[in-house]
């Protein structure tokens, strides 16, 4: 998800406020944006890798649900082609 949305402070705070993220969800999102791997998150936040992946899936679902109600949140890139075009 960190590659699917161009995260900045405004977008991050808007999403956190609209989606009513839990503390765990917010921490997972912030650490993903900072570049932590799923394994790092699991180790440092005392969770299993599957729990981190489950939370990431929940965050993506919440983003898709609240994005349509915000003028600030951009649509999430959904295809490999879109992400490839940004990189090259």
Placement of each model-derived feature along the sequence:
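Short alpha-helical "recognition helix" segments of helix-turn-helix
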Residues: 40-45
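C-terminal flanking helix
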Residues: 60-68
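Short helix-coil-helix linker/hinge
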Residues: 18-25
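Short, basic, alpha-helical segments at the C-terminal edge of helix-turn-helix-like DNA-binding modules
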Residues: 68-82
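Short, Lys/Arg-enriched N-terminal segment that forms or immediately precedes the first helix
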Residues: 3-18
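Short helix-to-turn junction characteristic of helix-turn-helix DNA-binding domains
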Residues: 31-35
């Amino acid at each position: 998800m960190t590659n699917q949305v161009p995260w900045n402070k405004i977008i991050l705070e808007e999403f956190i406020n609209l989606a009513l993220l839990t503390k765990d969800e917010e921490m997972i999102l912030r650490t993903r944006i900072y570049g932590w791997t799923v394994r790092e998150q699991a180790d440092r936040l005392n969770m299993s890798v599957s729990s981190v992946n489950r939370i990431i899936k929940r965050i993506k679902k919440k983003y898709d649900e609240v994005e349509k109600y915000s003028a600030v949140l951009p649509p999430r890139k959904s295809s490999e082609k879109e992400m490839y075009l940004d990189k090259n």
